[in-house]
Every structure is written in C-alpha cells, then in structure tokens.
From Swiss-Prot:
Gene, per the UniProt record: mnmA
Name this protein carries in UniProt: tRNA-specific 2-thiouridylase MnmA
Species for this entry: Erythrobacter litoralis (strain HTCC2594)
Keyword Cytoplasm: yes
Principal cellular location given in the protein's record: cytoplasm
InterPro entries the UniProt entry points to: MnmA-like (IPR004506), MnmA-like_C (IPR046885), MnmA-like_central (IPR046884), MnmA-like_central_sf (IPR023382), Rossmann-like_a/b/a_fold (IPR014729)
Length: 384
C-alpha cells in the first residue's frame, strides 16, 4: 500500500480540530459514514498527528426496510469506510445500531407521515444515534473530541462554543443540527465547515481515498429511491387507506386519494383533480378522517407557527432573529414570543407571510450565521 501523501491544507491540520493538548498526545474519534466528507475528516485527523479511531454505525438494512432482498446500501457504505480506514492505517470499529435507529428514527418517520405531518428524520438521527450514542462511544474510547463531516462551523464565543452556518451556503447543514446541546458542542468538531465541496474532493483525491468521486447522497438514507410512501405503507399498511380530496374553502369533494402518506403540505403534483379554475395545492391533511384538503396557493401563506420541544444553544442575543422552516430555504426575519430551550414551546411570527410551512418540520432560529436553536413546528396560523 502506498503511503498517504501530505495533504494540500489551507491551515495546519491540528488547528482544524482545536485540540485541548498537543496533537501527538491526543485521540480523535471520527464518525465515518462511508461518504467522501467523513472520509476526508478522517484523513485530516490522521494528518494532524493525533491518534485516530473511526466509528461507523450500521443503522439500517434497506432490503429489510422495503422488502427487497439483497439491497443493503448500508453494507456498501461500511465497506467504503473500512477501506478508507485501512488506507489511512487507523483503527475502525462498526457498531450495530439498527434496532435503536429503527425505533427512534424510522418508526417515528412512519408515524409522522401517518398523522399527516412532514417529518425530518435526519434531525432525529442527529439528536439520537449520531450524536448521543457516538459521543458516548467516543468518550468511552478516551477521545479528546468527536469529529464529523457535517458542513457547519464551531466558533469560539464569549460564552463558549457556538454553532454557525458553513461558509459555503450551498453545503450548509446547520438546519439539521439545531438540537445539538452545549455539552455536545463542546466535544464536537466540524473541520469541513470552512471548506467548499470542491476542496474536500481535492483532498480526498490527494489522500488516495477510493470514494473520492462517490456521489453525494440525495435522499433520506433509509429511503434511497425517494419513495417515502412505499416504506411507510410497508411499515404502516393503514397509510394506504383511500379517502376524499376536498376543497378547503367550499368543502366540495373533488376526488379520491390513495392514502394520505402520498401527500405533504404544499404539494401540487399527483392530485389528479383536473378541470379546476385555478391551480390547487395540498393545504392541510386530516389524518383522522383520511382527508386531503386542497386550495389555492394563497391558503399556504403562514403568519406564525407554534414550535414545541425547543432547544437553545447558548444565550439568546438581543439582536434581530431569522428562521428557516426547510433546509434549503433562506432564513427570513421573525419575532420570537415565549421561552426558547429546555423543551419549552415558543411562537415565531414571520415578518412576511411564509409559504410551505407544515407541522412536523423544524423551525430553526438564527442570529446572523449563528444557530440559536429551534424545535418542531406543531401548528401554524394562516396569513390568508
């Protein structure tokens, strides 16, 4: 095996991990998913001179989840992670977390869809297996920190570490990490937060990693084909119960649907209710009655939202705040009414009506680039 060449780094590798002691005396645990991002983090950690241990969680078997045989995407990712660890000459451990992942993430995903909500399972995964469990393992292994391939920044603040958006807005993943606690953030490191994706792939090539050109994942990991309804109906057959499609304003029955799991708030395609005088969108889901409510786009305008089970990272600053209700949305100005953090319920009011806000999504609050916290959207108030 050829030695790993020195990496073309913009800074000293050890400085990218903010280690509490000299790198030669430190131990870094890296969460390795098998993708190029976490693999480059492992290469950076190795280049720092610290002892490096890679950990991969086996979270799901796609074949079992969908009823298809011999389709275990997770297994391929584990092999990629192991190959990278071998290339770098670092220890690598795989832990079976399928049962916990199914209970904490996949089952909740199915239940949310069944209740008419729009789930964000990646956030629940970060709150559970990825951070809670990995952090515990890293500490048990005597690590000085746990490093991940997330595109966010950990910035030293007046009151301790702060979570900030990545410098590359196209890669920023801060929306998914609002649930990080202050204690967790103190131990976590995100060395990719200052880098564009192009630089990360160049580093992977320089290190000779076999997954340097591996495509980015585009879908939820346990739904790689993007067919959410299929996996929900496999787990919850009642999700395929048909029902009425009704006009939210007139109450008129416009057609029939094949199960509310096929629909989310804001959806327009797939309604199969042609001949209407104006375009209609899904504006609400009545799970108890198995009813899909549709209406004109103006009914999707939301003025405020109730956000539950909130988390706060550090003190709340006395500055203008913004919020995101979808990962790819731009933060928009808001006002906050109520406590934020410790599981409290708060209310966010949008300066301008916001579209596409649905129960089950996360409402993530920012002060500039800093993530203040957030919670789950429980209900909305129409601006129409």
């Amino acid at each position: 095996m050829n030695a790993v060449a020195p990496l073309p780094l913009p800074a000293d590798a050890a400085d990218m991990f903010d280690l509490p002691r000299p790198a030669a005396e430190s131990r870094i645990v890296v969460a390795m998913s098998g993708g190029v991002d976490s693999s480059v983090v492992a290469a950076l950690a190795h280049a720092s001179g610290a002892e490096v241990i890679g950990i991969t969680l086996q979270l799901y078997d796609y074949g079992a989840a969908t009823g298809r045989k011999g389709a275990c995407c997770a297994g391929d990712d584990i092999q990629d992670a192991r190959a990278v660890a071998d290339r770098l000459g670092i220890a690598h451990y795989v832990f079976d977390h399928e049962s916990a992942f199914r209970e904490d993430v996949v089952e909740q995903f199915a239940d949310d869809y069944l209740s008419g909500r729009t789930p964000v399972p990646c956030i629940r995964c970060n709150m559970g297996p990825k951070f809670t469990d990995l952090l515990r393992m890293a500490r048990e292994l005597g690590a000085d920190c746990l490093a991940t391939g997330h595109y966010v920044r950990r910035v030293a603040g007046e009151h301790g570490p702060e979570l900030h958006r990545a410098l590359d807005p196209a890669r920023d993943q801060s929306y998914f990490l609002y649930g990080t606690t202050e204690t967790q953030l103190d131990f976590l490191r995100f060395p990719l937060g200052d880098l564009p994706k192009t630089a990360v792939r160049e580093l992977a090539e320089a290190a000779g990693l076999r997954n340097a050109a591996k495509p980015d994942s585009q879908d939820i990991c346990f739904v790689p084909d993007g067919d959410y309804a299929k996996i929900v109906k496999t787990m919850r057959p009642e999700g395929g119960t048909p029902g009425d499609i009704v006009h939210a304003q007139t109450g008129e029955v416009l057609g029939q649907h094949k199960g509310i799991v096929h629909y989310t708030v804001g959806q327009r395609r797939g309604l199969e209710i042609g001949g209407q005088p104006e375009p209609l969108y899904v504006v609400g889901l009545d799970a108890a009655a198995s009813r899909v409510k549709v209406g004109p786009k103006r009914l999707l305008a939301v003025q405020a939202a109730s956000v539950i089970e909130t988390n706060r990272i550090g003190p709340l600053p006395d500055v203008p705040l913004t919020a995101k209700v979808r990962s790819l949305a731009k933060p928009v100005p808001i006002t906050l009414d109520g406590s934020l953090g410790d599981g409290a319920t708060t209310r966010i009011t949008f300066e301008q009506p916001e579209f596409g806000v649905a129960p089950g999504q996360a409402g993530v609050i920012y002060a500039g680039d800093r993530v203040i916290g957030g919670g789950w959207i429980d209900s909305t108030e129409s601006a129409a």
